[in-house]
A protein has these predicted regions:
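Short, intrinsically disordered, charge-balanced linker/junction segments flanking boundaries
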Residues: 191-197
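An N-terminally biased module of ancient metal coordination in phosphate/nucleic-acid-related enzymes
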Residues: 1-87
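Active-site neighborhood of phospho(di)ester-bond hydrolases with catalytic His/Asp-centered motifs
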Residues: 5-6, 37-41, 72-75, 144-146, ...
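Extended substrate/RNA-proximal surfaces in nucleic-acid metabolism proteins
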Residues: 49-180
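Short, flexible loop segments at the rims of nucleotide/cofactor-binding pockets, characterized by
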Residues: 12-17, 119-122, 179-185
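Aromatic/His-enriched, Gly/Pro-containing loop or helix-boundary segments
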Residues: 188
Length: 197
């Protein structure tokens, strides 16, 4: 069994510690028994430079520190748009297979807005379009709806979300292979929704 945390942030995201760096992420992951970490915020220009300086890439999709601790390329993107007469605010975790794909994702996002002001950038892109465009870059990219029950910024959020995965991702639903249930729910709550089976 691998214990992984695939949704983290670097020090350039709002409301994060300035002490967040690769060394501290590794240190505290080991203390907590986490075997694999996401890099967080790979779209942020300063953070991706720290990732490149502190992690070594190989052909497996896993990057490693000098001591061999594994990371996977990961970021979170906030999508804010209107659909069916309602404002939608959906956060998605994105996993990338390598640094070349990260650069292509970043290049695409730069055509839609800024990436330098926050580790979790915001774009006015509907979720189906977002998934479709990322799949044009690489079929190995994973888009994972983040903290799906959070009221304001999630797939099932009561204030700005949807009633089903299909309502949100439409024809791209088949490419959603995982959901992050987040801290706003527990397994018993999630088991009550059959579409999560």
């Amino acid at each position: 069994m691998i214990i992984a945390d695939l949704h983290i942030h670097g020090r350039y995201s709002q409301a994060t510690s300035k002490a967040l760096d690769i060394a501290n992420l590794e240190k505290y992951a080991k203390i907590k028994g986490v075997d694999l970490l996401g890099t967080g915020d790979f779209t942020h220009p300063k953070w991706i430079e720290e990732i490149k300086q502190n992690l070594t890439e190989n052909s497996t999709g896993i990057l490693r520190t000098k001591t061999g601790f594994p990371f996977i390329l990961q970021t979170e993107i906030s999508l804010i748009y209107s659909q069916d007469g309602k404002g939608r605010r959906i956060h998605n975790v994105v996993l990338a297979p390598d640094l070349e794909v990260v650069q292509q994702i970043t290049d695409y996002l730069l055509t839609k807005g800024r990436i330098d002001y926050d580790g979790r950038p915001i774009f006015k892109i509907p979720c189906p379009e977002f998934v479709s465009e990322l799949r044009k870059i690489s079929k190995k990219i994973e888009v994972i709806p983040a903290h799906i029950w959070t009221p304001w910024f999630s797939l099932f959020g009561s204030m700005s979300g949807f009633d089903s995965i299909k309502d949100c991702f439409q024809d791209q639903t088949k490419h959603i292979n995982a959901l992050e249930t987040g801290l706003s729910s527990d397994p018993a709550m999630n088991w009550r929704l059959s579409q999560l089976d």
